[in-house]
Amino acid sequence: MDYLIYRLSALDFTPNLGLLPPAEQAEAARRGNRYAIIRQLLRQELARRTGLSPAEMAFTYSPHGKPEFPPQPFNISHSGDCLCLAFHHRSIGVDVERMRPRRFHQLAGRFMCPEQLEGFLTRGCPELEFYTCWCAAEALVKHAGDTIWNAPRYPFRYNRGHIECLYDLAPCVKTFSPMPGYVGAVAYTI
């Protein structure tokens, strides 16, 4: 398992739309350069890892929209100025979040199971703990190809940065700090 971190503001180039298939070119026209740059970086990295041409790679999508590419499992996350591309030889999910003031207790009560709530509400830095738990929950649902609305299906216990999954056939989860002011987590099958 490995992941690459990019500072999006440092990626100052015009994307090569010829590396993208027509559907992604149309999406880039709607969403802008940042989308095109992210997709170009992803396709170039997949090409480096597989030897395939970036424009010829055909992704499939899970019922909840997770992009899949069987020759090289991957996942993408971006927040604010941070982009993370994660790769593994089996299923993988990644999430990065920029920490910012928000009503995290309300979000936590809506999306987290009791074991997760206990893990961050009893600690001294609830904002950091919340974002760590949130990233772990997102990484787990993305690993499964599911949606955050189903996060309670993937319970875990949180203890000082350590994630212990509480369900059968659970993946490994590692937390990390991709850059100052950001938190990340990656879930991957061993």
Locate the predicted segments by residue.
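Core catalytic alpha/beta fold that binds nucleotide/phospho-ligands
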Residues: 1-190
